[in-house]
C-alpha cells in the first residue's frame, strides 16, 4: 500500500507519550548521516497530523501511475485516453458541486434543528408558503442542472462521434472468455483466457492477466466492434473510459486513442454466469514498430498452426 511505502521512506519516529503532562515526544532516528532531534508537542496536535496524513493518502492512493485496481482505491484510475481525461475532470467538477450541496443542506438542517426547536421557539410560526423561497429553490437547482448538463452532453457527443479509424478490432464475448479478431491484418484471431492461479508467473496479476492480450499501437485511433456469442457480456476498461455491452445478435461499437504505453486492465461488467468474475480484459499499448513486429509474429504462429493441422490430417 502507498501509505506503508510512504512511512517506510520517512525517518523512523519513536513515539513516547508522557501521560502526566499529556505531551508527545518524538525522537527522529535517521541514518548515519542524519542528526537526531527531539521535540515535544501537544498530543492532540500530533494525532490530528496523523489523521490528516492517513486521510490524504487514502484519497490520493489511486492517483499513482497504475492502470489496474488498487487496494483502498476510491477514485478513478489515471486516465489514458481523451474520453477518460474528460470524464475524469468532469467527475472532479461534479464532486465539488455535490460536496457544496451536501454541506449547504447539512448546515441548513443543523441550523433549523437548533434555531427552531421547541426550547428556542416554543410558539411555532404558522404560514402556508413563501413565494421568494419557492422561487429560489426552483431557479437555483435549474441553474445547477444546466451547468452540469452542458459539459455532460459535450462529452457524450465526443464519445459517440467516431473519428477516422486507424485500426479495427472485433470483440466477441463468450462464457467465460473473450475472442478477438483483427480484420485489417488477414483476420488474425485468438482467444483470451484468464491465467489460473496455478499458472500465474511472477509479475502477473491475479484475476487480471490473460494468456493473450489485445495489442494496439499508441496514439492510434482504434475502433472496437463488440458482440457476444451466447449471453450478454460487457466490455469495460476503466482507465480508457469505455463500457460497452456485448449483446448476442447485435454489434455495438466504441473507440479509443491511448496516449500512454502500458497494460490496461478491465473486466466483464455484466453478470453472465458462474464464472463472470473470471473474464478479465488486458490491453497492451506499444510503439507502432513493436505492434508491427507482434502482428508478424502472430501471423507466423497462426500459419504454423494451420500447417500442423494439415499435416496431422
Curated annotation (Swiss-Prot):
Gene3D superfamilies referenced in this protein's UniProt entry, alphabetically: 1.10.287.90, Cupredoxins - blue copper proteins
A molecular function GO annotation: cytochrome-c oxidase activity
Positions of the RPE1 insert domain: 5-51
Reaction catalysis annotation: 4 Fe(II)-[cytochrome c] + O2 + 8 H(+)(in) = 4 Fe(III)-[cytochrome c] + 2 H2O + 4 H(+)(out)
GO BP: any one term: ATP synthesis coupled electron transport
Cofactor(s) this protein cannot do without: Cu cation; heme
EC number: 7.1.1.9
One term under GO cellular component: plasma membrane
Free-text remark on how the cofactor is bound: Binds a copper A center.
Membrane topology: Multi-pass membrane protein
Keywords on record: Cell membrane, Copper, Electron transport, Heme, Iron, Membrane, Metal-binding, Respiratory chain, Translocase, Transmembrane, Transmembrane helix, Transport
Membrane-spanning parts: 39-59, 94-114, 131-151
Residues reported to bind Cu cation: 233, 268, 272, 276
Protein localization: Cell membrane
Pfam family, one: COX2_TM
Disulfide feature: none
NCBIfam families: CoxB (TIGR02866), RPE1 (TIGR01045)
Family label: Belongs to the cytochrome c oxidase subunit 2 family.
Function: Subunits I and II form the functional core of the enzyme complex. Electrons originating in cytochrome c are transferred via heme a and Cu(A) to the binuclear center formed by heme a3 and Cu(B).
Protein name: Probable cytochrome c oxidase subunit 2
Name of encoding gene: ctaC
